[in-house]
UniProtKB/Swiss-Prot annotation:
Disulfide bonds: none annotated. The keyword Transport does not apply. PROSITE patterns: INTEGRASE, TRANSPOSASE_IS30. Required for the transposition of the insertion element. InterPro entries: Integrase_cat-core, IS30-like_HTH, RNaseH-like_sf, RNaseH_sf, Transposase-Integrase, Transposase_IS30-like, Transposase_IS30_CS. The keyword Membrane does not apply. It comes from Escherichia coli (strain K12). Keywords: DNA recombination, DNA-binding, Transposable element, Transposition. Belongs to the transposase IS30 family. GO terms for biological process: DNA integration; DNA transposition; transposition. This is Transposase InsI for insertion sequence element IS30C. Gene3D superfamilies: Homeodomain-like, Ribonuclease H-like superfamily/Ribonuclease H. Residues 213-379 form the Integrase catalytic domain.
Length: 383
């Protein structure tokens, strides 16, 4: 027999999912099957729908349970109506539209009433075609809903018809009943899951401690670097792909300007050469410091500093949050180069195009300016 859920049970499904509970565990709690839980969540992308306000004139679940009890006791329709202070015709229609006296079930009848009573508010992007076109264009450029919303507010402040909240974009993508943005456009989001996940995930597989000879610890970094007041202080790391392929990523702490470098290998010679060549091509005001993790790929950090004048600082073991700007940017880069991708197939020109897209995205932390705007303005002021 098909399992039906009360409104309270449905609410608990969404609450458990929001808190990071998996399909199987939710199913065990409610005595259901994981596939049933997934189907319930899928229709709204894991987002809890708004509770519908019931009119006083409509039958409630408790009244429907009284109807079921009365039918089981072989009471007449009129007697049930009198007990509930309802019109006999109301009770009669309720029973007939829900499989009659013999098969009437309160929960099924209540769920059916909820389905039939839905009067969805017209979707904003269904009504506003210019806005929909803009949103779709930016999604295809891999902008986040928050970046799209903030960019519209900053660049088109007087055009009230071109306003949309990030949550409206998310709901239009995830609610399958809304067709203004096809749910397949979820692939353009940073986390392209079919359901929205909670944030309560743990990281696994952190690398062990590696001793860097003569490495300067991050705790000796000056306050001027920590407060992000000047350009030229970078965070860096490697992003790995299949077939032992790697790229190096660099992010300026103040502007969030991103550089992606193609590497011949992960060895310290290859990494040192790529970093040295790149930093020597930058203006002197953008060559101040570099913060890296404790990977052996930067074992030649002293050679790098002598060649470029850039001081290198190393994070504590298993402390990726100490270069959080770079960690966040690597997540953005993974939109373009998912795991199990061979990174060796991409040319430096192709990597530069990806970096250009990231550098032209408005960022909330920059008040929806772009990294390119910030770094170009900063360099111009020092000329």
């Amino acid at each position: 027999m098909r399992r039906t859920f009360t409104a309270e049970e449905k609410a608990s499904v969404f609450e458990l999912w929001k808190n990071g509970t998996g399909f199987s565990e939710i199913a065990n709690i409610l005595g259901s099957k994981p596939g049933t839980i997934f189907t319930m969540l899928r229709d709204t992308g894991g987002i809890k729908p708004h509770e519908r306000k019931r009119a006083v004139a409509h039958l409630t679940l408790s009244e429907r349970e009284e109807i079921r009890a009365g039918l089981s006791a072989k009471m007449s329709i009129r007697a049930i109506a009198t007990a509930l202070n309802r019109s006999p015709s109301t009770i009669s229609r309720e029973v007939q539209r829900n499989r009659g006296r013999r098969y009437y079930k309160a929960v099924d009848a209540n769920n059916r009433a909820n389905r039939m009573a839905k009067r969805p508010k017209p979707c904003l992007l269904d009504q506003n075609l210019p806005l929909r076109k803009l949103v779709l264009e930016k999604l295809e450029m891999k902008w986040s809903p928050e970046q799209i919303s903030g960019w519209l507010r900053r660049t088109k402040p007087r055009q009230k018809t071109l306003r949309i909240s990030p949550e409206t974009i998310y709901k239009t993508l995830y609610f399958r009943s809304r067709e203004a943005l096809h749910h397949l456009n979820i692939q353009h989001l940073r986390r392209s899951h079919s359901l929205r996940h909670g944030r309560r995930h743990t990281r696994k597989g952190e690398r062990g401690t590696i001793n860097i000879v003569n490495g300067t610890p991050i705790h000796e970094r000056s306050r001027n670097i920590d407060n992000r007041r000047s350009l030229g202080h970078w965070e860096g790391d490697l992003v790995s792909g299949t077939k032992n392929s790697h790229i190096a990523t660099l992010v300026d702490r103040k502007s969030r300007y991103t550089i992606i470098l193609r590497l011949r290998g992960k060895d310290s010679v290859s990494v040192n050469q790529a970093l040295t060549d790149k930093f020597l091509s930058l203006p002197s005001e953008l060559r101040k410091s570099l913060t890296w993790d404790r990977g052996m790929e930067l074992a030649r950090h002293l050679e790098f500093t002598v060649s470029t004048g850039v001081k290198v600082y190393f994070c504590d073991p298993q402390s990726p949050w100490q270069r959080g700007t770079n960690e966040n940017t690597n997540g953005l880069i993974r939109q373009y180069f998912p795991k199990k991708t061979c990174l060796a197939q991409y040319t430096q020109h192709e990597l530069d195009l990806v970096a250009a897209q990231l550098n032209n995205r408005p960022r909330k932390t920059l008040k929806f300016k772009t990294p390119k705007e910030i770094i170009e303005r900063g360099v111009a002021l020092t000329d």
